[in-house]
Every structure is written in structure tokens, then in C-alpha cells.
From Swiss-Prot:
Domain Agouti: 92-131
GO annotations of cellular component type: extracellular space
Protein localization: Secreted
Claim: Transit peptide is one of the keywords in the record: no
Gene: ASIP
Organism of this sequence: Sus scrofa (Pig)
General function of this protein: Involved in the regulation of melanogenesis. The binding of ASP to MC1R precludes alpha-MSH initiated signaling and thus blocks production of cAMP, leading to a down-regulation of eumelanogenesis (brown/black pigment) and thus increasing synthesis of pheomelanin (yellow/red pigment).
Residues linked to a glycan: 39
Source species, domain of life: Eukaryota
Major localisation: secreted
UniProt free text on domains: The presence of a 'disulfide through disulfide knot' structurally defines this protein as a knottin.
Keyword Amino-acid biosynthesis: no
Region ranges (Disordered): 58-92
Keywords: Disulfide bond, Glycoprotein, Knottin, Secreted, Signal
Name of protein: Agouti-signaling protein
Amino acid sequence: MDVTRLLLATLLVCLCFFTASSHLAPEEKSKDERSLRSNSSMNLLDFPSVSIVALNKKSKKISRKEAEKRSSKKKASMKKVAQPRPPRPAPCVANRDSCKPPALACCDPCAFCQCRFFRSACSCRVLNPTC
């Protein structure tokens, strides 16, 4: 009985080893060093050289100012026309008041009823201030 357990344990270890090795990525091996050298020299020549230039304080300030101008222009162009908010429902629940499902809707059109603890504690909350 001990021999069969030993045989089964060995078989299990071999299966684990082959399973793990079959999932590993295969390694790429070059056939000769000449192809490796030619590939590395070709790759270096393909890319342009990089030069590093130190910026002084004045150029940093100018670039920061230009960036602020560009961002303000983008914000001005991206602003949408203010859409009118939908009217409030007549009987409604104020923010941070209880709004369990049989209760009425929230007064703020940007608010919604958020429930916690398996819908035992519900309240109207505004999570998107830009609404």
C-alpha cells in the first residue's frame, strides 16, 4: 500500500511539473551571434538620437503661462450651454432626509436616493456637484 501511495505521489508531482512548464512562455534563442549583432546594430540606427536640454526658470515660467492660456482656451471651448434643470417634483424629500423606496422623490434634480445596510438606511445625496 505504501508503494502505491509513493507511485501516485510521484505521478502527481510529475503532472504538476508538466502542467506548470507547459504554461510558461517559450524563450527565444538565436542560432548564431552574428544575427544577434546585426539585429542590435539595426535597432540602434533606426531610432533618432535624444538630446537633453536644461530649462532655466524664465523658460519654465513662460511655458507654465502658455499652458495655462491653452487650458483656459480649451475650457472655454468645451463649456456647454447651460441646460435648464428639470422642475422639482411637488411633494419631495430634502437632501440628507430619509427616502426609503415607498417615499417620494428627492427635491434636488441632481440628487438620488442612496441606500445602505440592506436598504435599512436611505437618504437623498448629491454626488455630482457639476450636475
